[in-house]
Amino acid sequence: MVEVERVRYSDTLEREKIRAMIKARKEKQKEQTVENEKAVCPECGSRNLVHDYERAELVCGDCGLVIDADFVDEGPEWRAFDHDQRMKRSRVGAPMTYTIHDKGLSTMIDWRNRDSYGKSISSKNRAQLYRLRKWQRRIRVSNATERNLAFALSELDRMASALGLPRTVRETAAVVYRKAVDKNLIRGRSIEGVAAAALYAACRQCSVPRTLDEIEEVSRVSRKEIGRTYRFISRELALKLMPTSPIDYVPRFCSGLNLKGEVQSKSVEILRQASEKELTSGRGPTGVAAAAIYIASILCGERRTQREVADVAGVTEVTIRNRYKELAEELDIEIIL
């Protein structure tokens, strides 16, 4: 009898807890509804409010009034590539990065012999600190896979820095390389070759194109090996890579030639017309982009020589002449030299 009463009592407690949870949830939803009703533009009364997280501002989408500034971004500090990663990383902590072999989750002992107050460590404790550093390095890189990642990711970072690539490209390249390691695609290939191929694939995925020649200049492997490894990993990892467009090269080439935005816009316009007439198919994107910039610079009164354009684009003057003649003839562009 006593046991039955205990069961009934526990059931009653569970029901009360569930009712309390439902009540709290309804009250929270009601508060959110009230807040949303209050969130209107004081200038025009619009509810079309836009959160600009880059500037930390709340802006009216209709009249442009800045309603609130310097608000706190309550979003996560990490990145996720799929739903599972997003669910696993629902936490607060140090930022996570794929560009470090341990994803930035371990600690590191500084190389300077100073304490947390900036004071120099006594000679008596320096030997102990040296041993701690040595064991910390061994613990961080404890097996062959981690050693592989540590070397490859440092190589990726070096090449990306030499090419001036943004953080997103580095993260993407690190993800591609990690997938190649997980599928055991490194066996029989050099680490430098796979790292260079991963960086080339990441550049194409992020629409920040770099040519194989540019990757070769900063890597320690040949152009042929990079291309062969790239084709292999893109096939094995089923990477979805769109053909590189000549338009993607225009901003970088124009910047290298110190050309104004008018020339860049004209170059893009020429390339779009060429693409509609399928004049870019089967031709190197850098050569077509260089020819379009050469034509646009003449039309806009900021002429650059074929030699200057060729040096920035990494193509020959002959290529520019051939592509320039094709574009001018097919698009009926009159150029006064």
From Swiss-Prot:
Protein's GO biological process:
transcription preinitiation complex assembly
Q: Where does Zn(2+) bind?
A: C41, C44, C60, C63
sequence repeats located where?
A: 154-237, 248-329
Q: Which Pfam families match?
A: TFIIB (PF00382), Zn_Ribbon_TF (PF08271)
Task: Identify the GO cellular component terms for this protein.
Answer: transcription preinitiation complex
An example of a GO molecular function for this protein is:
DNA-binding transcription factor activity
InterPro entries xrefs:
Cyclin-like_dom (IPR013763), Cyclin-like_sf (IPR036915), TFIIB (IPR000812), TFIIB_arc (IPR023484), TFIIB_CS (IPR023486), TFIIB_cyclin (IPR013150), Znf_TFIIB (IPR013137)
Q: Which UniProt keywords apply?
A: Metal-binding, Repeat, Transcription, Transcription regulation, Zinc, Zinc-finger
Zn-finger (TFIIB-type) residues? 37-68
Q: What this chain does, per the record?
A: Stabilizes TBP binding to an archaeal box-A promoter. Also responsible for recruiting RNA polymerase II to the pre-initiation complex (DNA-TBP-TFIIB).
**HAMAP family in alphabetical order:** TF2B_arch
Family membership, please give it: Belongs to the TFIIB family.
PANTHER family in UniProt:
TRANSCRIPTION INITIATION FACTOR IIB, TRANSCRIPTION INITIATION FACTOR IIB-RELATED
Protein name, entry field: Transcription initiation factor IIB
